[in-house]
Amino acid sequence: KTRLQTQYPWELLTVKEGTTLLRNPDLVNWVYQAASGSFALPLINVGEWLSDRLDAVAQELGWMLMPSLALSQMRSMRGDFDNIRSLLNSQGIQIPPEARGAYRDLEYERGGFRLYAIMWVLSETSEPEWMLLIALGSQPQAQMPRTLKLEVRDETQPLVTQALSDTNQGILYAQVIGNWNERFWITVTADDEAVFEIPPF
């Protein structure tokens, strides 16, 4: 179930978001379908990433598989994830060599940024768990948003909400642990105006 099936839109949206919604017939139709449960939300299968494959949903949404995150290959990887990884390491976040990930460029009227999703298996016991790390970085040839907000939630509640009032001062990231049956939804807000809802992992 999505939150639209248990709550009214005005309980979930700000006045500004509600105004944007009402001015866009496609969004109104989408909210109606989500609230009535008349369509299935696409699900990104990050388990495929462990085998260096992208599922059809991820491909359609513009996700690009990253090369192995082993340190030896990381140095030659283009983009800014190596910088993000260094900053995460300095904050005590260690990404294991067996981790796999993908990125997706998100753009809006005033600029754009890159969303990285990294996952790895924590345990393969009778109740296996996996880690999902979401990090936001700059996108080549795009103006980075001045402010960013990142929310990760499961089917019932927000799990992590992080905000960065000045993207020049650091990076925004969140990590959650789940079992194989859990799904996580990602919402990113750029400059308090552009809202990106990422289909669940």
Which residue ranges define each predicted feature?
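C-terminal, beta-strand-rich globular interaction domains
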Residues: 93-201
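Long, hydrophobic alpha/beta structural blocks
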Residues: 1-107
